[in-house]
Amino acid sequence: MKPERRRLGFWVGGGMLAGGLLPFLLYWLLMGDFSSVTVGQAKRLLEKTNSMAALVDVRSPEAAAANPVSGAVNWPASIVSSSNRPADMPPSLRGKTLILMDEDGLGSARIARMLRSGEGLEVFSLSGGMAAWDAGPSARHTPSRLRPMSIAQQCIAVATGFGVKPAHMVLCVLVILWLWRQRAPDLVALRWGLLIFWLGEVACAINFVVADETSEFWEYLHNYGNSVGFSFTTFAVLEGLDRRVIKYSAPKDRCAAIGLCRACIKYADVPCGLRRIFSLIIPATIVIAFMLLCAPIHFVSYNTGIFGSITTYSHLVGSQLYELRYCSLLPIALLVASWLVLLCRRRDPVTPAKILFAAATGPLAFGFVRLFVFSIYNDELVWANFWEEATEFLYVFSAAAVLWIFRDSLFVKPAPANGLASSVPA
């Protein structure tokens, strides 16, 4: 392997690893040291004979009344924050092991950390919050807590889980195998993008089968796989347009934009029109990224029946923090870096700027897709799931269609380009 390819592979792989681990680090810094229990562990503690454990609902009185939890004592977080001593607790909770729960498990974890600092307090946080509790057997088999779903919606749910999703996963594998021996940089990037996207979808399937879509870990792997997969695909599109259509990076080929520029940087000491347009697109994309950062977070979780089978629909707050906050802040940082490289680097600035731009576009596009479907269908998550899977099917199908339509030219090795763009690790 050439040194340039090894170096680029190191930076891309290192960036993916750092980008994947950063949310875990941020979560740890935010939540600090606390102990959490699963729904099963919490129920075992509560059901023990002479149990000294108590379930504490730290949501507001209004939220607790709207969606009550049997056996839970409502102790609102606003009051808990000023009552960190055993003597300040409600009498029914004194001397007991406390299991705190709220909508998402994040606020209860912070409160648990605060209460554990009080002498003699043993406090746990319910992992997953109400979303996990609603997925538990007691809530799932309480008819009054089941949201009705029409026959058409039940059919859509079945078609999504057993039709659309398996279809695009199988098609994705076929396209990956088709691209397996290709060495052109754009096709290699597309292959990696589809492979990482497929691994994310595998994590999604595991979350559905094993955890009933309540595992933040598997959902994070799903989200991260989609984001990185879209980034590689964006780079594949940019690289393919450059090398095969525009011919910007090929030093001996005539740039397709020369008719607009009249003079070309390849042949004269003039500013490059495409580079100047790129330097305007990047700041515009930064502005758009702030739309995600300003979007509100809405917790939603409910149980429903699908042809006699009880299932839980939820949009976890941890996932929304990734989609709306991380997928805006990280792209903003990458886009700023891309813009600075384009303005300040003298030798071949477009190639690294293009890589950084593609890295930013993936999570940004993923965040906007999630924002779009869950904003429209926030109260009917069956439709949100359907349109997300349908969009993913269109993504894979579009890649396959382009490869098939232009197969005679795409699978011919393109002319080498000048710069690292021709050195994408295979």
Regions found by a protein language model. Name each.
Residues 203-216, 293-314, 368-380:
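Juxtamembrane "helix-exit" motif on the non-cytosolic side of transmembrane helices
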Residues 3-43, 53, 61-99, 103-148:
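Rhodanese-like catalytic fold shared by cysteine-dependent sulfurtransferases
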Residues 213-226, 318, 379-392:
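Non-cytosolic membrane-interface motifs at loop->transmembrane helix junctions
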Residues 148-171, 320-332:
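Hydrophobic transmembrane alpha-helical segments in integral membrane proteins
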Residues 172-180, 326-351, 404-406:
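Alpha-helical transmembrane segments in multipass membrane proteins, preferentially the mid-helix core
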Residues 189-210, 358-374:
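Hydrophobic alpha-helical transmembrane segments of multi-pass membrane proteins
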Residues 182-197, 274-284, 348-362, 414-417:
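Membrane-interfacial loop-to-transmembrane alpha-helix junctions, especially the N-terminal start
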Residues 2-4, 243-278, 412-426:
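Membrane-interfacial, low-structure loops and terminal tails that flank and connect transmembrane helices
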